[in-house]
């Protein structure tokens, strides 16, 4: 037990063994009696420090340890290694069951009924006046645990019962440890280790890696005990409680349940050193029993005493969506054991199920080779990852995926459901192909050893555990990137910092691919599995680094805080240096990717984004070049009604004045309207058709009347001149930078080119305040374009140049959003319905920002 100036308490959020160091804590019994605990010592010092007084049971424990060592030596000498292994394996199983089953049952009853405490009270074991044999023995036993001048009668029964319980725990734990270590020692290939310990070969690497794991395990145990002291080490809160504030520290900041998780990494280190798969299987058995003890003994007690995790108490976003939204059900999630949330009324769930069945049946019938299946798995992973990353990136920047469904008449919830289906389907296909690939390698190729396969399965188990913890913490909403699609549903703009996220900010980057690397071990370091694991890890890292992290900053306004692992690491100088190095490499990588790989803005992109001025200035220089080529300068092609900004608003009529020498004029001359980016660099010949956007300059031409928009025509002794108009019947209805070209006779030879100008839709963004105003503005615009009938319908046949795409672009220009042409057709081009839908989409997208 820790001293009164440095006590410990379990974390009251349901997380087991999250103990903390605190300044002052006064224990209290179940009867609320508060007391200052005496000083206690850890197990090793209590047993082996000769300066400390020993109790009778402690002497017995020491004797049993020595006896087991002697037994091991003589059994090995006279009975052989195999028989000795059986003896100590049997002992280990007995003591391990005594620990996990025996102590587990005792603690279970103590937790629920205070059985040990009540037994002590009922039989007056610690009563000063009690004189029965059991009472005298108990008092004699624990009196050795008190310092001189202190008395057991000063403390409540709960404390004394706990001290006595510790003695039996020490016996079981020390025998459990001793018999396991002796079993491992007997299993060691001593000659192989001694001959290869200084060599850089598989055996030498394996041995040194195992040694490092054992040393790490020792550090975990020492650090854990320095944090939790004896109180939590010996399950003190099953007997009495302590009041204190919580401050996480040490190894409990690095990993959940460290005494049960990484606290057993030494088992696997010893398995590596021995190279014996029997030792590995025994270690796994012991570790699994420990996890069962954690699950069925400690966790229920912690939740009962301190309450469950706070995240479980709060209603998740998914539960709120199910309750508040019509036609929404929780998404299908493919797990290691099958499907979660399967809905027999959702067709997409059946698609996923049929896809899995088709892949398995197809592989059974076609029986592809391992290489073929590996190529399919690798290609599928690359394609699906690129699709997922593209959707998430565009969704984060422009709500592209949601807009796509909104434009086609669906709502944002349906869009999110479709993303859930796509993401889960991709994950399911990738994992089922990986499982089949491993199976085919196991059947058709050389499989690895028992050790590599077992360690591979352990890595797979780590990934399953990691995914389970992540899902438990962030639920379906976080699992399916809900904050990319429905950030408006987030009540608290605060990043998760509980569960596994207390220890690691992005656990999926490390443990989320552990099982993928486990397949490398299972498939005996196959090159194809190395490629798969590398690809999987790279896409995982890229997604977190360049998509998730920037989006979290955008939505939550802050980056994730330092994880427990990072805080613990930076306490040490080497940790600070290592983190500094990682940060520098990370920054260099960012600089390289964003300066070398991100393409610079092109002219076409500038055109799309509205950066018109630089393009127009460039084209004015080209215009002067054409004039110089004409030589005389007696050529003129001017736009009459252009403003100072070189802009004309659709559908204004455009008047053009022209003049050429009589020698250059031909009655079949004509003027065409072209988009600058489509005409290319050739300023002497137009190599693209005008698509009907042209007019003759003379009424005596051989052209049809539809293309004779002549306002004026005349000539004198030197020049022929006139003016024409481009009205809505031949005008372009697409925004962009345009120019007029005067062509000679019935050819595409350019005589002169007008000044470039911008053709834009009217701007109403600032003036449109509500949906009714938007409807009125849209109808007015369509009426000016001559495509509105019955005061409410858009008629596609009124103007072949004003299409559904044009109307879509109008809404995009006016409201920064639009609907699809398919949706327009479904409404029979009803302007009221279409405009109301556009307004609704705008409100939804604004709400998602």
Curated annotation (Swiss-Prot):
Ranges in the topological domain labelled Cytoplasmic: 77-85, 189-199, 253-264, 372-375, 439-451, 531-849
Catalytic activity annotation: a 1,2-diacyl-sn-glycero-3-phosphoethanolamine + S-adenosyl-L-methionine = a 1,2-diacyl-sn-glycero-3-phospho-N-methylethanolamine + S-adenosyl-L-homocysteine + H(+)
Keyword Signal: no
Signal peptide range in chain numbering: none
Pathway where this protein functions: Phospholipid metabolism; phosphatidylcholine biosynthesis
EC number in record: 2.1.1.17
A molecular function (GO) term: phosphatidylethanolamine N-methyltransferase activity
InterPro entries named in the record: Phopholipid_MeTrfase, Phosphatid-EA_MeTrfase_fun
GO terms for biological process, alphabetical: methylation; phosphatidylcholine biosynthetic process
Compartments (UniProt record): Endoplasmic reticulum membrane
One cellular component term from this protein's GO annotations in UniProt: endoplasmic reticulum membrane
UniProt cross-references to Pfam families, sorted A to Z: PEMT
Chief location: endoplasmic reticulum
Regions of this protein lying in the Lumenal compartment: 1-55, 107-167, 221-231, 286-350, 394-417, 473-509
Disulfide bonds listed in the record: none
Keywords, comma-separated and alphabetical: Endoplasmic reticulum, Lipid biosynthesis, Lipid metabolism, Membrane, Methyltransferase, Phospholipid biosynthesis, Phospholipid metabolism, S-adenosyl-L-methionine, Transferase, Transmembrane, Transmembrane helix
Record field: transmembrane: 56-76, 86-106, 168-188, 200-220, 232-252, 265-285, 351-371, 376-393, 418-438, 452-472, 510-530
PROSITE patterns in the record: SAM_CHO2 (PS51598)
Broadest EC class assigned to this enzyme: transferase
Membrane topology annotation: Multi-pass membrane protein
Described purpose of this protein according to its UniProt entry: Catalyzes the first step of the methylation pathway of phosphatidylcholine biosynthesis, the SAM-dependent methylation of phosphatidylethanolamine (PE) to phosphatidylmonomethylethanolamine (PMME).
Entry similarity comment: Belongs to the class VI-like SAM-binding methyltransferase superfamily. CHO2 family.
PANTHER family linked: PHOSPHATIDYLETHANOLAMINE N-METHYLTRANSFERASE
Protein name: Phosphatidylethanolamine N-methyltransferase
Taxonomic source organism: Kluyveromyces lactis (strain ATCC 8585 / CBS 2359 / DSM 70799 / NBRC 1267 / NRRL Y-1140 / WM37) (Yeast)
Gene name, Swiss-Prot/TrEMBL: CHO2
């Amino acid at each position: 037990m820790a001293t009164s100036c440095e006590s410990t308490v379990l974390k009251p959020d349901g997380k087991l063994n999250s103990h903390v160091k605190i300044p002052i804590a006064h224990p209290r019994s179940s009867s609320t009696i508060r007391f200052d605990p005496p000083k206690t010592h850890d197990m090793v010092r209590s047993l082996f420090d000769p300066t400390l007084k020993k109790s009778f049971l402690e002497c017995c424990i020491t004797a049993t340890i020595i006896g087991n060592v002697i037994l091991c030596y003589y059994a090995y000498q006279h009975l052989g290694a195999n028989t000795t292994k059986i003896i100590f394996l049997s002992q280990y199983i007995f003591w391990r069951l005594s620990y996990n089953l025996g102590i587990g049952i005792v603690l279970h009853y103590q937790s629920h009924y205070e059985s040990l405490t009540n037994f002590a009270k009922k039989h007056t074991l610690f009563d000063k006046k009690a004189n029965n044999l059991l009472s005298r023995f108990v008092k004699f036993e624990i009196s050795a645990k008190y310092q001189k001048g202190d008395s057991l009668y000063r403390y409540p029964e709960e404390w004394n019962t706990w001290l006595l319980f510790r003695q039996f725990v020490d016996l079981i734990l020390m025998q459990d440890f001793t018999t396991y270590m002796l079993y491992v020692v007997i299993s060691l290939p001593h000659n192989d280790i001694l001959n290869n310990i200084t060599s850089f070969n598989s055996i030498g690497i394996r041995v040194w890696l195992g040694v490092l794991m054992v040393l790490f395990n020792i550090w975990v145990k020492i650090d854990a005990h320095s944090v939790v002291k004896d109180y939590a080490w010996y399950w003190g809160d099953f007997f009495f409680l302590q009041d204190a504030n919580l401050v996480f520290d040490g190894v409990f900041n690095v990993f959940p349940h460290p005494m049960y998780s990484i606290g057993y990494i030494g088992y696997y280190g010893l398995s590596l050193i021995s190279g014996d798969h029997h030792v590995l299987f025994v270690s796994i058995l012991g570790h699994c029993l420990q996890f069962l003890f954690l699950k069925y003994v400690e966790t229920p007690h912690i939740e009962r005493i301190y309450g469950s995790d706070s995240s479980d108490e709060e209603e998740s976003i998914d539960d709120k969506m199910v309750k508040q939204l019509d036609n929404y059900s929780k998404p299908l999630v493919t797990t290691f054991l099958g499907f979660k949330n399967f809905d027999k009324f959702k067709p997409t769930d059946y698609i996923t199920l049929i896809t899995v069945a088709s892949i398995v049946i197809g592989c059974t019938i076609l029986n592809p080779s391992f290489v073929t299946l590996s190529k399919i798995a690798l290609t599928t992973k690359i394609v699906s990852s690129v699709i997922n990353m593209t959707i998430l990136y565009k969704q984060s920047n422009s709500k592209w995926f949601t807009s796509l469904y909104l434009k086609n008449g669906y709502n944002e919830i349906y869009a999110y459901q479709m993303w859930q289906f796509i993401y889960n389907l991709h994950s399911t296909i990738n994992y089922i192909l990986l499982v089949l690939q491993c199976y085919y390698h196991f059947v058709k190729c050389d499989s690895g050893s028992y050790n590599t396969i077992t360690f591979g399965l352990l890595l797979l188990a780590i990934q399953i555990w990691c995914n389970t913890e992540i899902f438990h913490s962030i639920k379906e909403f976080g699992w399916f990137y809900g904050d990319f699609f429905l950030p408006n549903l987030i009540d608290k703009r605060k990043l998760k910092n509980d569960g596994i996220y207390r220890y690691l900010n992005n656990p999926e980057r490390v443990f989320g691919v552990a099982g993928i690397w486990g397949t490398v071990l299972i498939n005996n370091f196959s090159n194809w599995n190395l490629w798969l694991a590398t690809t999987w890890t790279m896409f995982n890292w890229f997604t977190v680094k360049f998509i998730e992290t920037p989006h979290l900053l955008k939505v939550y306004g802050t980056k994730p805080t330092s994880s427990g692992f990072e805080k613990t690491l930076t306490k040490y100088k080497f940790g600070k240096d290592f983190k500094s190095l990682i940060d520098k490499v990370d920054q260099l990588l960012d600089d390289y990717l964003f300066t070398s790989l991100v393409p610079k803005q092109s002219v076409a992109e500038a055109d799309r984004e509205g950066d018109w001025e630089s393009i127009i200035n460039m084209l004015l220089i080209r215009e002067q070049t054409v004039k110089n080529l004409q030589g005389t300068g007696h050529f003129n092609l001017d736009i009459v009604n252009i403003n100072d900004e070189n802009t004309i608003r659709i559908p204004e009529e455009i008047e053009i004045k022209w003049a050429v020498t009589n020698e250059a004029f031909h009655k079949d001359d004509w003027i065409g309207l072209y988009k600058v980016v489509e005409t290319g660099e050739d300023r002497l010949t137009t190599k693209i058709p005008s698509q009907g956007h042209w007019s003759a300059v003379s009424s005596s031409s051989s052209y049809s009347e539809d293309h004779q928009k002549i306002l004026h025509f005349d000539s004198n002794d030197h020049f022929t001149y006139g003016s024409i108009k481009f009205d809505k019947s031949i005008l372009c209805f697409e925004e962009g930078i345009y120019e007029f070209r005067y062509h000679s006779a019935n050819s595409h030879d350019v005589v002169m080119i007008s000044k470039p100008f911008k053709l834009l839709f009217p701007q109403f963004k600032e003036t449109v305040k509500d949906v009714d105003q938007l409807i009125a503005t849209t109808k007015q615009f369509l009426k000016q374009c001559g495509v509105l009938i019955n005061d409410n319908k858009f008629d596609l046949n009124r103007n072949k140049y004003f299409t559904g795409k044009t109307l879509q672009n109008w809404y995009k220009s006016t409201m920064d959003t639009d609907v699809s042409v398919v949706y327009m057709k479904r409404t029979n081009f009803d302007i009221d319905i279409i405009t109301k839908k556009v307004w609704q989409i705008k409100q939804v997208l604004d709400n998602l920002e």
